[in-house]
Amino acid sequence: MALVLVLNSGSSSIKFQLVDPTAHATDDPFASGLVEQIGEPQGRVTLKHAGEKFVVEAPIPDHSAGLALAFDLMGEHKCGPTDVEIIAVGHRVVHGGILFSQPQVITDEIMDMVRDLIPLAPLHNPANIDGIEVARKILPDVAHVAVFDTGFFHDMPPAAAIYAIDAKTAADHGVRRYGFHGTSHEYVSHKVAELLDLPEGAINQITLHLGNGASCAAIRGGKAIDTSMGMTPLSGLVMGTRSGDIDPGIVFHLHRQAGMSIDEIDELLNKKSGVKGISGVNDFRELRTMIDAGDQDAWLAYNIYIHQLRRYIGSYMIALGRVNAITFTAGVGENDVAVRADALSHLEGFGIKIDPERNALPNTGPREISTDDSAIKVFVVPTNEELAIARYAKALSGA
């Protein structure tokens, strides 16, 4: 079996999957795992393979040691590089800037270009680079492919991509809307075309990637024309711990009046805001339990979340003019029945009708949750970014 190793390297973790790029979207990966607590006194590698789970705990000083330990564990359980045919390695890279609209076979020149983008993603791209460098050393004889989170939004119309600030300042410092979760939005939009049995060029759709991070996209004829995240993943929808859209003047106010540093405000808006900032929790299952128990802060957090979601859905319906489908994906979007119903509950005037029984069905795969006579189809489509990355990697590797 020809497999692609898919890596998602974070600052202190590495997610990995061995994926058959020809597999069905609902198939489990051949193997998957997580290296975590890199740089801490005690790290952990978890591997899932053949219906079993294996865990090793050991010091993991850096990404190189973490990936080596993961490969050792995979080898012990007959799914390592010497046991299976790895035809390519696909790497998730968060920020491609204006340089990359498509996945790229990684060369030394491409690596230099990705390094140049670190100022745009100082929390993410360095970790992505670490993972690529380590993997290229361990697997030097296969193609390594970078798939950029921003790529799908690269060619948005200027009216959506350009911020109304001094043009020279923006150009000098790379300030514009880049968008994120692009691999997920693109993957889901392809699935919607299959569900509608229409060519993508004939479809206008809104995709809602609702996880701890959340974003939405307006897609016309297979091309993104707008998205909620901006220069960074902080803007747009209310998220688990991120504020989403706020008045930029709040940053100045907190700096001047509260004496908060830029780093403190960064931490506040990225890690201590959103649903967690209002309710104290960012897990929607916990939030629902608190709401059911009568917790008013939880109820307020939920209402703010839904209010912002409706605002974006409504504005994208106007931007698109005609909408064939609205689709929910990612952890909250795929599993939270109430969020889906409430997000669309004030849009009946557009002819959107949710079927409560269909909406309440468990998350078993792509499915329609609107009524047969709904003017706009509503779908739930489980995202599979790893499979999308694996398919890109296979295609570009020539294997």
Curated annotation (Swiss-Prot):
GO molecular function terms noted in the UniProt entry: acetate kinase activity; ATP binding; magnesium ion binding
Pathway: Metabolic intermediate biosynthesis; acetyl-CoA biosynthesis; acetyl-CoA from acetate: step 1/2
Location (main, coarse): cytoplasm
Gene3D superfamilies: 3.30.420.40
Domain of life, source organism: Bacteria
Residue positions of the active site: 149 (proton donor/acceptor)
Cofactor: binding comment: Mg(2+). Can also accept Mn(2+).
Catalytic activity: acetate + ATP = acetyl phosphate + ADP
Family: Belongs to the acetokinase family.
Protein name: Acetate kinase
